[in-house]
Amino acid sequence: MSADVSGTESGSESGPEPEPGPEPGPESRPESRPKPGPGPEPRPESGPEPGPRSGLRRGPKQGSERSQLCPEHFEPLSWFCLSERRPVCATCAGFGGRCHRHRIRRAEEHAEELRNKIVDQCERLQLQSAGISKYMAEVLQGKNQKAVVMASAARDLIIQRLSLVRSLCESEEQRLLEQVHGEEERAHQSILTQRAHWVDAVQKLDTLRTNMVDMITHLDDLQLIQREQEIFERAEEAEGILDPQDSEKLSFNEKCAWSPLLTQLWAASVLGSLSGVEEVLIDERTVSPLLHLSEDRRTLTFIAKKSKVCSDEPERFDHWPNALAATAFQTGLHAWIVNVKHSCAYKVGVASDQLPRKGSGNDCRLGHNAFSWVFSRYDQEFCFSHNGYHEPLPLLRCPAQLGMLLDLQAGELVFYEPASGTVLHIHRASFPQVLFPVFAVADQLISIVRGPLATVRLDSPPHHPCRSGHASR
């Protein structure tokens, strides 16, 4: 777009514009100065030229610039036309010249601006290269080590469980080990691919930066202007190299080691053996005043009114009908069974020793905080609850017994029905170091099954119709 030099148009490029008058220059000159003749035009007055940034050297001296003359007026190409994007002489830019009404600026100013842009781009390329190098050195290396460790842990877990049921699942063992190996190879290959990609990206960035530095140091103003399009193309190519981002494809997927068949057989093997069942007793100091504890410390019975006999100990739950076991689990594999056939409102599971005991808030309510993981029933509704999240469990019948299997090494809590051999729910998490079996009952009673009774299986378990409980969840 053209604009009259006498106006005050503002454009994206700053610089002096020509004014009407007898002088051929784009700036106003002193009245005492003569009109330009056919020879070289005197240099217009200007302030000190800005020096190059970041310590980069300027191009060749002005002697080589004067050797470039206007083909029409044979004058130095000391000005740059922003409208036609080409260098022009002072006569072309002055009054009556072909670029008289165009936006112009000094060629050296335009070249200096290009130099500054190249310097800025070089700095950005250097920072981008440093970021990619840091990503390769820290993130990719850590991902590779973590994938190897996680793959090894998953492999050991699979072999340990399959040792209990080797005769029934040899083919399953082979399949799962191949999946773990394939996932490990996939994660490792993804990391290698990422590393190769970013090494190539760094090399491209270094090459682009080197070429741009060469342009600054070896090209004069006119040559630099003539290669402006190439400069922008290289800058655009550099912008096309994105910054590295973390991805799940670089991580080992633990789900490749999960197997419903393996979990079913493993849980049945542990709960079906006498040595696999814990001797769990309830800690009478934690029993709520709404519950009555039997003499053998295995049965909890709900009572409508709070007992006045219970002392107010710090370990006791004073509002919700809860109780903790006296047995603490810190490592290894643990299993226990609870008889729940008489109750339509109960919760069973595990809880951390950090579970609060006093008050009516959710911080003391099982399944509504981060310190408890429970299987709960209310009337005909079943769910798994943790930290306020309740996952419904569609059961076809009310279980008479509930088996719990806690594997602290694998971070798994399995709720299991011993009578049918059915896994009701599996929860995987990073559990705290100390866990206790936890119980809550708001209807009738529940009781912990003794160890020797854990091997009992009912060929046709009796159906217990679900009764509506009267206590709140």
Swiss-Prot record:
Zinc finger (B box-type) residue ranges? 65-113
| One GO MF term attached to the UniProt entry | vitamin D binding
Q: Does the keyword field hold Zinc-finger?
A: yes
Biased composition, class Pro residues, residue ranges: 35-51
Query: What is known about the tissue distribution of this protein?
Result: According to PubMed:10978534, testis-specific. According to PubMed:16371431, broadly expressed.
Q: Which GO terms describe its cellular component?
A: cytoplasm; membrane
Q: How does it assemble?
A: Interacts with YWHAZ/14-3-3 protein zeta. Interacts with TRPV5 and TRPV6.
User: What is the recorded function of this protein according to its Swiss-Prot or TrEMBL entry?
Assistant: May regulate epithelial calcium transport by inhibiting TRPV5 activity.
Q: What is this protein called?
A: B box and SPRY domain-containing protein
According to its UniProt entry, this protein's organism is Mus musculus
